[in-house]
């Protein structure tokens, strides 16, 4: 400093009192710097902990997997798409696509049923599909007009097309929801195959035949009152559409005054029971309702008949209802129930889920199921889901003489015996 003519005494004249007692008056106190970041650190820490807690749930699910491949062995479509169930989890976590056609998965829960660790693979398929903007490719949806109609009615401007709670005749604490197969014109979906012969609404008509025989007052919650339950939209990955349908239906069901909601459609039943929050309302499948209310009409088949029963994936593996439908059928005098090779929790899927991927691969699964039906020697193949009936009927309408057995919903089968008893 001597070289530039400055000494300590001269420099001291330029000093300024520093409230933080630091030599540099322009520097921030360390406490002030820390205080500026407290909100960021606090909020960031909370967000981090929340995200981490969510992540650990998925991480835990991933780490449960042994890598034993039992899930792949159980998967009905594995041979068609060479998919790896373990990759579904990891690719969901990493938001990656391994090239496996995720829409070919039937979400039938056969993999989770086989898993020794009970990993819920279907939930990961659900998440992956929800990440796809715009929903599934049109090539995966055989009935695009049908899906467009159901998606359009989810919008608020369509609310006025449905009857209000105040104007709808509800005179019972029990409500019955028919599902979309009863609402949609049968010509709209299957006319090119069956020339309009399939009666998709028979399960509903038959259900009320049984309710009347049991002297049970049940209110019909038709599709002029409630919208589609949203099952197909949810499992196609159209979460926004599903949430709109759910919000509308949930509000009206809660306001209807019923305490029990019954449906013959396994998909509708599962959706209301698992994906809706219906406080104080018991959701039941029609067969479950009949069993719990002591359905016993001393029915007798007109002729001895051999039947077999197909477990719907949504009703069986996902809702664990296996015995009820069988008990109702075997209670009919003159009926012999013969099980197929794959039945109960090991039952094969009908090959179509959420109205997606109705193709040669799914057809092969139905052919396999029909071979099992023929092996039982059954005259009638029974099930408890109108959608399963419709998918199996599609194959039967091809006219193969080997498929000479009848396909019926359990509810329709029971109603037939009731009508025969009345005419006897």
What positions do the PLM features span?
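Ferredoxin-type iron-sulfur electron-transfer modules and their immediate structural context
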Residues: 1-104
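Iron-sulfur-cluster electron-transfer modules
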Residues: 56-62, 82-226, 232-263, 269, ...
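Short cysteine clusters
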Residues: 65-71, 75, 105-111, 115, ...
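Secreted/processed peptides and extracellular or luminal domains of membrane proteins
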Residues: 71-77, 81, 111-117, 121, ...
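Cofactor-cradling patches in redox/metallo enzymes
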Residues: 185-202, 206-285, 316-330, 335-424
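A nucleotide-sugar donor-handling region in carbohydrate enzymes
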Residues: 283-293
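C-terminal amphipathic alpha-helical segment
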Residues: 293-332
